[in-house]
Amino acid sequence: MAMRIRMYDNVAQYLSDKEAIDAAVLSVLESGELVMGPDVRALEEEFAAYCGTNYAVGVTSGTSALLLALRALGIGEGDEVITVANSDIPTSQAVTLTGAKVVWVDIEPVGCNMDPDQVEAAITPKTRAVLPVHLHGVPADLG
């Protein structure tokens, strides 16, 4: 017997705490400090404490987060980064912005995530990172 799993309902989640969400968004918009303001600073401090670290940096997009992570690893010109071919553009864009070459691998047929066998076959002396993407709520096989 097949089990039906409901999709995540963004509207229901929003409506469950609408007043608090609206107040927080309005406060940030009215402050004019969307990126580097006190609310972001507070979030960074709370997140760092939650993670048990001294620092956390909030960024404006997933692309920026990926780019910072790749740059922190020293990835750049002449390097290769392996990622899955069926990801969205920002994954490959972040790699390209470092000057590194994107090496795409295909998916495995069950979870539609990167195929570990293809990752292994794609590794060269220039490979500096493997950038998995966990699609559709299914974690990629990192083993």
Residue ranges and their predicted role:
Residues 71-143:
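PLP-dependent aminotransferase-like
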Residues 1-72, 76, 97-98:
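Conserved PLP-binding active-site segment in aminotransferase class I/II-type PLP enzymes
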